[in-house]
């Protein structure tokens, strides 16, 4: 494997998709204490593609939610390959609202190729569930931090990433759709996926440059699986500083900053001389 500074977007995507890539539950176990997982959306059922609950961090209670993939075929079937259904997003929203009620900071780990697009998910209101999360997260009166730890795919990722600060691990990706999908739609040729990955600007460094994310967390060469403790320690230190800073910010200022952060994404200024 090349030095991390020399990796192409496609190589980073390959690392992000590795079965060995550390999952949300692994980071939760290393970063937080006394994690207690909650289940169910109180409307339809539970979704194992999203895990969440209450934990202790730096002596304070926090709410932690993460999209969860599996390590093998059986686990991935149970977790639906990390593609959440409507009940998963509604479970996440239940935990977000509970965090707000008890004034607990919220930390989200994003790792999904996208929301589940099966017929049953559409029948249960997948679009509505995602949209409800977007508007609700924008208005949460608590500090919110989201970290893309693997794949950040489309609205399925954004539904857990409307946050005061959005971070990415160095070899994670965040995009509207997959390079394979992009190539199929734009060029009618999915074999040009590597080329699409270059064009789409899906890497942490690219997105940091565009102001879409706020921080890039370094990984060891070859990916986080080669030293998850190093990555977890870096996340812990950065979370401590960020939560302290956000907790000292007034609610109105917090909400205004969050709103303005997302309003700036995609903004451009035309040159009046041309």
UniProtKB/Swiss-Prot annotation:
One of its GO terms (cellular component) is acetyl-CoA carboxylase complex. InterPro entries: Acetyl_CoA_COase_a_su (IPR001095), ClpP/crotonase-like_dom_sf (IPR029045), COA_CT_C (IPR011763). The keyword Secreted does not apply. One of its GO terms (molecular function) is carboxyl- or carbamoyltransferase activity. Pfam families: ACCA. Keywords: ATP-binding, Cytoplasm, Fatty acid biosynthesis, Fatty acid metabolism, Lipid biosynthesis, Lipid metabolism, Nucleotide-binding, Transferase. Pathway: Lipid metabolism; malonyl-CoA biosynthesis; malonyl-CoA from acetyl-CoA: step 1/1. It is found in: Cytoplasm. Its main location: cytoplasm. The keyword Transferase applies. Residues 1-245 form the CoA carboxyltransferase C-terminal domain. It catalyses: N(6)-carboxybiotinyl-L-lysyl-[protein] + acetyl-CoA = N(6)-biotinyl-L-lysyl-[protein] + malonyl-CoA. Its EC number is 2.1.3.15. One of its GO terms (biological process) is fatty acid biosynthetic process. It comes from the Bacteria. SUPFAM superfamilies: ClpP/crotonase. Belongs to the AccA family. NCBIfam families: accA (TIGR00513), AccA_sub (NF041504), PRK05724.1 (NF004344). Component of the acetyl coenzyme A carboxylase (ACC) complex. First, biotin carboxylase catalyzes the carboxylation of biotin on its carrier protein (BCCP) and then the CO(2) group is transferred by the carboxyltransferase to acetyl-CoA to form malonyl-CoA. Acetyl-CoA carboxylase is a heterohexamer composed of biotin carboxyl carrier protein (AccB), biotin carboxylase (AccC) and two subunits each of ACCase subunit alpha (AccA) and ACCase subunit beta (AccD). This is Acetyl-coenzyme A carboxylase carboxyl transferase subunit alpha.
């Amino acid at each position: 494997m090349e030095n991390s500074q020399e990796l192409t977007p496609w190589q980073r995507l390959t690392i992000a998709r590795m079965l060995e890539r550390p999952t949300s539950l692994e980071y939760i176990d290393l970063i937080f204490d006394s994690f207690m997982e909650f289940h169910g959306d109180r409307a339809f059922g539970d979704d194992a593609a999203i895990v969440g609950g209450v934990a202790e961090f730096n002596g304070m209670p926090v709410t932690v939610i993460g999209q969860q993939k599996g390590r093998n075929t059986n686990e991935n079937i149970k977790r639906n390959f990390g593609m959440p259904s409507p009940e998963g997003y509604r479970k996440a929203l239940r935990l977000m609202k509970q965090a707000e009620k008890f004034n607990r900071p919220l930390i989200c780990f994003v790792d999904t190729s996208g929301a589940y697009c099966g017929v049953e998910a559409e029948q249960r209101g997948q679009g509505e569930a995602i949209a409800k999360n977007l508007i609700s997260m924008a208005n949460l009166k608590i500090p919110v931090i989201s970290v893309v730890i693997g794949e950040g795919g489309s609205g399925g990722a954004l539904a857990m990433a409307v946050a005061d600060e959005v971070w990415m691990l160095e070899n994670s990706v965040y995009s509207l759709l997959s390079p394979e999908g992009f190539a199929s739609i734009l060029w009618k040729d999915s074999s040009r996926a590597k080329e699409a990955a270059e064009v789409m600007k899906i890497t942490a460094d690219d997105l940091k440059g565009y102001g879409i994310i706020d921080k890039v967390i370094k990984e060891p060469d070859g990916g986080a699986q080669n030293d998850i403790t190093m990555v977890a320690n870096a996340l812990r230190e950065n979370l401590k500083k960020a939560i302290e800073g956000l907790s000292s910010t007034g609610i109105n200022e917090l909400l205004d900053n969050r709103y303005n952060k997302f309003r700036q994404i995609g903004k451009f200024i035309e040159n009046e001389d041309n």
